[in-house]
Amino acid sequence: MLLGSLGVAAIGVLSACGGNDSPSTSASSSSGKNSSAAGAAGSILVWTDSNREPVLRKVAEQFKSDTGVTVKLAVKDFAKIPDDFITQAPTGKGPDAAIAAHDATGRMVQNGVIAPLELGEISAYQDVAIQAFTVNGKIYGVPYATENIALVRNTTFVKDAPKTFDDMIEMGKKSGAKYPFLVGLDPKQSDPYHLYPFQASFGAPVFELKDKGFDSSKVAMGGTNGEKFASWLADQGKTKNFNLNVSQDISKDLFAKGQAAFILTGPWSLDSFTKAGIKYEISEVPSAGDRPATPFVGVQGFWMSAKTKDAVATQKFLVEYIGNPNVQTELFKVGHRPPASKQAFEKAKTDKDVAAFGAVGQKAVPMPNIPAMGSVWADWGVAQAEIISGKASSPKATWDAMVKAIDEKIKKG
């Protein structure tokens, strides 16, 4: 049994401490006793992706046994969940809960389709995971995993981690590798997510930084520091350190073929490197400016619908079962993303790769979760691509125009 000793009594104690385009459904088949804590026996619907479905199916069986409530699972395309949720929740046909990436949370709150959750002892979770699902002081998700990028180096070419971006390029050139450094980009949209650590190292964060994350009402990537980054970005395009024609898939493939000394990527790429027999090490992203290169961290979790007809059972399933360290450990095994639960993370970090990415993630900041981020990413990426490609006659002017456009969109809400 997945949860082993996780009976009703154990659940009470522990609670204190991204598929297919067309949905398919499965329901837990175990029968068991009812629990007044979960309300009258009935059913709830949870949207998940295909990767997490096998784990959730076992958790659903345990929940059915403990409470009498059936958890129906619908497998969905992870990327389509936010839009489908917004469309279906108001009609009463949406789920009671859904797997989610935190950065869409603000939009979901704005549309009134998700409800805040009472997590109990929030100190049981990584601080950054709680911050990620927090909107206007309320927590709107049960986090289960975090992910961030880091620098991966082929130790056949380079033994030691670089301290600065320039050091990295120099080490890569001297290594004998065909490509000193790779980062996957898009010809029209660049990739602000992957390039953000370098931007942050110039003192140009996307928004003003506060103790608990960003103040998303104040765009902070403009001014002198932003212009310095824009000029640096143009230089990287000229020297081909950044190549818009090298996508994420291409960069990963080249590194897996042993043709690159360094690559900027996340844990999602490691399986292909391991299968290819590449010997690698993971380290912090080297700074290009005079400040630390701070990456974004993405957090995955589960939302509860504001339209659920059984908030008690849904909250119980999410907080006490999905939030359980044993369950988060099982979810880690299928995704290899560091668990959001501190207890589960301690167990997972015996894997050196998890420990390395987790160490970088401790210094990362959550991707902003405001509703306007869709427009922010678009404007940001287009400006970067124009600068890197050399199409921007004035990198500084292009950057300043982008910042102004984003600022106006943020103010409009």
Feature locations, PLM:
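A structural signal for short loop-to-beta-strand junctions that line the ligand-binding cleft
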Residues: 88, 95-96, 122-153, 180, ...
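Extracytoplasmic/periplasmic solute-binding protein
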Residues: 140-144, 149, 169-218, 260
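Long, aromatic- and glycine/proline-rich binding clefts that accommodate carbohydrate-like moieties
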Residues: 283, 331-386, 411
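Extracytoplasmic/periplasmic substrate-recognition and gating elements
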Residues: 139, 274-334, 393, 411-412
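Hinge/lid segment of periplasmic solute-binding proteins
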Residues: 102-149, 160, 165-169, 177, ...
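Conserved N-terminal structural module of periplasmic/extracytoplasmic solute-binding proteins
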Residues: 2-105, 289, 313, 397, ...
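Glycine-centered hinge/linker elements that transmit conformational signals in sensory
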Residues: 214-244
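Short helix-initiation/N-cap motifs at beta->coil->alpha
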Residues: 76-84, 103, 167, 243-256
